[in-house]
Amino acid sequence: MTTKKSAEVLVYPIFTVRWLAIHGIAVPTIFFLGAITAMQFIQR
């Protein structure tokens, strides 16, 4: 708890599994939400 470096070593190695799980869901979700909201404004 004295240095920030020891905390960063414990916090940051979770970059592969959690990062892929979050972005594997979040990136297509944001893309489809943007596509659906864009479709609302298309006039025929």
UniProtKB/Swiss-Prot annotation:
Keywords: Chloroplast, Electron transport, Heme, Iron, Membrane, Metal-binding, Photosynthesis, Photosystem II, Plastid, Thylakoid, Transmembrane, Transmembrane helix, Transport. This is Cytochrome b559 subunit beta. GO terms for cellular component: chloroplast thylakoid membrane; photosystem II reaction center. It comes from Chlamydomonas reinhardtii. Its main location: plastid. The lineage of its organism: Eukaryota, Viridiplantae, Chlorophyta, core chlorophytes, Chlorophyceae. With its partner (PsbE) binds heme. PSII binds additional chlorophylls, carotenoids and specific lipids. The gene is psbF. The chain crosses the membrane at residues 19-35. The keyword Ion transport does not apply. Heterodimer of an alpha subunit and a beta subunit. PSII is composed of 1 copy each of membrane proteins PsbA, PsbB, PsbC, PsbD, PsbE, PsbF, PsbH, PsbI, PsbJ, PsbK, PsbL, PsbM, PsbT, PsbX, PsbY, PsbZ, Psb30/Ycf12, at least 3 peripheral proteins of the oxygen-evolving complex and a large number of cofactors. It forms dimeric complexes.
